[in-house]
Amino acid sequence: MTSPEASATPFEPKKILAQLPHMPGVYRYYDTTGAVLYVGKARDLKKRVSSYFTKTQLSPRIAMMVTRIARIETTVTRSEAEALLLENNLIKALAPRYNILFRDDKSYPYLKLTAHRFPRMAYYRGSVDKQNQYFGPFPSAWAVRESIQILQRVFQLRTCEDSVFNNRTRPCLLHQIGRCTAPCVGAISEEDYAVDVSNAARFLLGRQSEVMKELEQKMHAFAAELKFEQAAAVRNQMSSLATVLHQQAIEVGSDSDVDILAVVAQGGRVCVNLAMVRGGRHLGDKAYFPTHVESALTLAEGGLGEEVEPAEAVDATADAPVDTVPDQPAEEAGSARGAAAASVEAEVLDAFIAQHYLGNRVPPVLVVSHAPASRDLLELLSEQAGHKVSLVRQPQGQRRAWLSMAEQNARLALARLLSEQGSQQARTRALADTLSYDSDDLATLRIECFDISHTMGEATQASCVVYHHHKMQSSEYRRYNITGITPGDDYAAMRQVLTRRYEKMVEQAAQAAAVDEAAGIDGESTRQAEASSLLPNIVLIDGGKGQVEIARQVFTELGLDTSMLVGVAKGEGRKVGLETLVFADGRAPLELGKESAALMLVAQIRDEAHRFAITGMRAKRAKARQTSRLEELEGVGAKRRQRLLARFGGLRGVVAASVEELASVEGISHALAEQIYKQLH
């Protein structure tokens, strides 16, 4: 890796370019603040990076980026495939401004069959292991739960936790309604249950005909042995399976595992719709909306995009494969790329495939709406997956229907997003006008809202939610545990949370001002500018005059502008639409009509603050009630406490256990079991 230049040394690209090798690798551009502008890969670092500084006809946006480059770092790799993998990891980690970015959904849901002797069927998110069986990934939690319901109806596998399974003495309701064979009480043998598990696994893998054929043979065998009750049970199972297959006839195809990727660009935004087929069943889809698209695409339009060797789309039913472009030097490739320049959709699809599949499971077939990634990317995906990954560009039959449906869903999702963005921007403008907030760019308007939640003074929590860039910013939400107050004193709770929230910001502004004053700069101007950059423009308080008065006192003590404080007082009967806005700077209360766009935004932010506060309060209260007694036990640490809860299913089960049962738990001796029993009784 090249070492960054010292900050005092002026940026001289010629010296850096002269030192670059003719080798594959990854390059990174930084600005004067150290922020990453762009991450790219190259089969020849010297030629690739030099092209940014030697070409004379750069687009204005590319030229602007080049003028901002203050530092270049490169990393040499052994191959272009390694460079591609490193580039993808760096884009995810650094989020450069000029790269297309997708939200990193690290955890897709799976359907899990555990390694228990009576395997449990469960919804699962997280990293997979080799001990259990995993089916998926699925595009949504709904798709997993629907599959679980189908398997319950047909194969009657258990879904209960192991701690519940180990402690049952009679069948649960699921057994009574025909959704579980009750292995917990020995209603089915381990061998018969294993057969059901095997059939369920084959069903998920798309081998439904095999399952149906074996069930039919089993039914005839029972009938020949005059075991008519068993034959009737198998017949009912076949009937349930046939019903499921009939209901899903439109979805089921000959393909086993296929992903369908459709890209649509409209109104300055792009949507990638990912539909998943697993075991021949269409499981639904999910829409993705990348950011930084415009900035990234200017690089491609200017002939400075990624060095892509288009992949050949292959399929026996495809009309024709996509033409490939042979390897060319960087300076010669520009004209070829200009003649067959990738569309916006193709560039976005390149980024999506790299960021979505590298490091994740890849199906054997990707049906795509545009010729996407380079052959290097496909080879890397195939190597990672352990099987060949094929791209289908012009599908036929069922695959064409799937792609058409994915494209339509992408258009609908994009239209919905654009409509919501327009509506949200209109609400922001309405609120700004109502509060006489003047700004040329309303996207910079930052609103913070506070709410207090507790139950009869127990587990008091305050929440702070943030509205910025015309939407709620959940990553900036914060919860505050309120302590040292009289239980139920909402005023004291509001005083504490506002002080804790803004006192640090005021201190940071004061410290910056002190530094500037020491350097002979106007410290007061610095303090005001620093405070403005840290503080919100509007602070909403969920409450009336009393809460607003407390907020006014806190802001006055901190030297903050009280005009940004707005209370949201509930109307008569606490009905939505009858709220009154209360101000801390002496303005008269303001009542907005039910149809007011400004009130709709205020209610949206206030309701989100309430939801965030109450969920945190409930979790805190539940944790205190369920674990406090176990945490107080002498000789019982976190691991032993976890084993007790897993063995007995909860605090109630631990309390009801005998000394002998407690001693049967790993890590708990008979003497400790007696001690635990005495402390709980």
From Swiss-Prot:
UVR domain span: 209-244
Subcellular location(s) per record: Cytoplasm
Main location per the UniProt record: cytoplasm
Cross-referenced InterPro entries: GIY-YIG_endonuc, GIY-YIG_endonuc_sf, GIY-YIG_UvrC_Cho, Hlx-hairpin-Hlx_DNA-bd_motif, RuvA_2-like, UVR_dom, UVR_dom_sf, UvrABC_protein_C
Gene Ontology molecular function: any one: DNA binding
Entry-linked SMART domains: GIYc, HhH1
UniProt family annotation: Belongs to the UvrC family.
Function: The UvrABC repair system catalyzes the recognition and processing of DNA lesions. UvrC both incises the 5' and 3' sides of the lesion. The N-terminal half is responsible for the 3' incision and the C-terminal half is responsible for the 5' incision.
Subunit-structure text: Interacts with UvrB in an incision complex.
Name of the protein described by the UniProt record: UvrABC system protein C
Source species of the chain: Burkholderia cenocepacia (strain HI2424)
